[in-house]
Amino acid sequence: CNFNLSKRIKPRKQKAKLGEYSTFLEKEIFEQADCIRDSTRGRFSKDYSSVVFGGIDTNKEIKRVVFLGCGTAYHAGLLGKYYMENIAGIPASVEISSEYRYKNNPTEDGTLVVAISQSGETIDTLFAVREAQDKGVDTIAITNTVMSSIARQVEEGIYQRVGQEVSVASTKAFTSQVTLILMLAVLLGRKNKLSAIESKEYIKQIRYLPKLVGDTLELCKESIKKTAVASSLTPSCTFLGRQYMYPIAIEGALKLKELCYISTHGYPTGELKHGPIAHMCPMYF
C-alpha cells in the first residue's frame, strides 16, 4: 500500500484482550499462523504465479538491496539478504540502523533501501532512511503502522497487517516481516533470474505457511515445556545455525535474553570451534 496519504487520520486506540491465554506473549506466539495468512492475503496474482504489492513500483530496475533494522527487525533483514541473493539473484546487504547513519555508505543507481520496523517509530531507522534519501536512494518500508513516522518518510511501503503487538519480545511481527521479505524477493526475482514455474512453486509454499506454522505450534507444546524445564537453571545459552538458520539462531538468543535475563549468544554453526566453544561447561545449554 502507498503510505503517503494526503489526509490526516486520528489513530484508533485498541485494547488488546488475552482471551484464553495467560500472557500476551503466549497469545501472540499462537497468532502467528493467522498473521502470516493476513499478511499474504490478496497479494498474489489470480493464477498464483506472481507476487503483487499494490504500493511498490515494479518498473524500477533494482541492482542492489540494503535492509535497515534494529534488533529483531535487523535479524529479519539478515534473512532478507539470503532471500534476495539466493532467490532473486540480487546482491544484498543488511545494516544496523544506528550504525548506517555514521558510515560512508556507497550508493549506486538501482539501489533500494528497505527499512524494517514494526512500530514505524524506531528513531535510528527513521534517521537511517533520511540518510539514504539524502543520497538519492529509493526507500520503502515494511511496517505494521500505516501512518507512523517511517511510513510517511518513505516513498512506498508494505503494511504487515498483524494487529497490535503488546509483548516487548516480538514474535508475530517478526514472522510477518520475514514472510513479506520472502515475497519481495520472489517479486524482484521475476524481473531477474526467477522463472514463472519457480515463482509459482515459491508462492505455493508461502500459501502453505499458515497451516505449517499452526500445526508446528500445536505439535511442539509439550516438548517446549520439557525443554524449558531442562534449561531453566542454565546460566548461559548458545544458539547455533547455518545459512537461513543463522539469523534464527541470533533471534532466538535475543528472545531468551529479553525474556529470561540470562547471558545468550548466537553464532553460525561453523564458528563454534573458533572461540565460542571455550566457555562451554556442564551447566551450559
Question: Model regions: which residues?
Answer:
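Short, flexible active-site loop motifs that bind/organize anionic cofactors or intermediates
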Residues: 26, 115, 239
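Glycine-rich phosphate-binding loops that contact phosphosugars or nucleotide phosphates
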Residues: 60-208, 242, 281-282
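Histidine-centered active-site/metal-ligand motif
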Residues: 27, 75, 274
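Short, acidic Gly/Pro/Ser/Thr-rich loop/turn segments
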Residues: 2, 73-75, 245-247
